[in-house]
Design a protein with these regions (language model features):
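RNA substrate-binding interface of SAM-dependent RNA methyltransferases
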Residues: 1-110, 171-182
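Generic hydrophobic-segment detector
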Residues: 25, 85, 125-129, 159
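Short, well-ordered alpha-helix to beta-strand connector turns
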Residues: 40, 102, 128, 148-149
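Secondary-structure boundary/capping motif
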Residues: 52-55, 114-115, 140, 161-162
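Short secondary-structure transition/capping segments
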Residues: 55-59, 119, 164-165
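Long, charge-patterned amphipathic alpha-helical coiled-coil/hairpin "stalk" segments used as oligomerization
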Residues: 107-144, 154
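Structured adenosyl-cofactor binding patch, chiefly the S-adenosyl-L-methionine
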Residues: 138-183
Length: 183
C-alpha cells in the first residue's frame, strides 16, 4: 500500500533558505489524479498554516460536495484520496491506523547522494506500507530527509537538466513504482 505526502514545510527556497511554501491548486489536482490513476491509498497535503489548510479544504470541498462534483465527476473521484494535515507526523499516524503498521518513509530529492534507493529496489519492496515524501519549493529540508528510512534516487532524463515540478515528479514516481511494466 502506497501513500504520498506533499510537504510544504520545512522546504528550501531558491536561495537555499528554509521556508514554508504555499499550497497550489495545480499540485492538489494533478497529484490527486496521478495518485488515483496508480492506486495510491492516500495523498496527504501537509501544511503547518491553518489558513493554507483552510484553502486546501475549500478547494477539495468544491470538487467533492460542491458544484464541481456535478461539473466534473472524474475530478471529484480523483480528489477522494486527498487529506489535509498539519504535519508529517499526523500523516504518518493516519497511514499507520489504516494499515496497522508504520509506513516505510521514503524521501525524494533531485540531488544525487550516496546510498540512495533505486526505483527498481523500492518497487520490489512495496509489500510493506510505504510513504513517498515529496517536497515543494526547492526540495525537502534535511530534517525531513534525515527522519526517513530511505532516500529515493533522483529522476533523470537523457540531459543534465533536472528541475521537474513536484506534480511531474510525483507522476513519474507513481509510474515507475506502480505502473504496468509490459512495454
Amino acid at each position: 500500500m502506497m501513500f504520498i505526502s506533499l510537504v510544504h514545510h520545512p522546504v528550501y527556497d531558491r536561495r537555499g533558505n528554509i521556508q514554508t511554501s504555499s499550497i497550489t491548486t495545480f499540485d492538489i489536482h494533478d497529484l490527486a489524479r496521478s495518485s488515483t490513476t496508480y492506486g495510491v491509498e492516500r495523498l496527504y497535503l501537509v501544511h503547518p498554516s491553518p489558513l493554507q489548510r483552510q484553502v486546501a479544504e475549500r478547494i477539495l470541498g468544491f470538487w467533492e460536495v460542491g458544484g464541481g462534483k456535478e461539473w466534473n465527476p472524474l475530478r471529484s473521484q480523483a480528489l477522494e484520496v486527498t487529506r489535509v494535515t498539519a504535519s508529517l507526523d499526523l500523516a504518518i499516524e493516519d497511514a499507520t491506523k489504516l494499515t496497522g503498521e508504520k509506513p516505510v518513509l521514503v524521501a525524494t530529492t533531485a540531488k544525487t547522494k550516496e546510498g540512495q534507493t533505486t526505483f527498481g529496489q523500492l518497487r520490489k519492496n512495496l509489500d510493506r506500507p510505504t510513504m513517498i515524501i515529496l517536497g515543494t519549493g526547492w526540495g525537502l529540508a534535511p530534517e525531513v530527509i534525515d527522519r526517513c528510512d530511505l532516500v529515493l534516487e533522483p529522476i533523470w532524463g537523457p540531459t543534465e537538466f533536472n528541475h521537474l515540478s513536484v506534480r511531474a515528479a510525483g507522476a513519474i514516481i507513481c509510474d515507475r513504482l506502480l505502473g504496468k511494466r509490459n512495454i
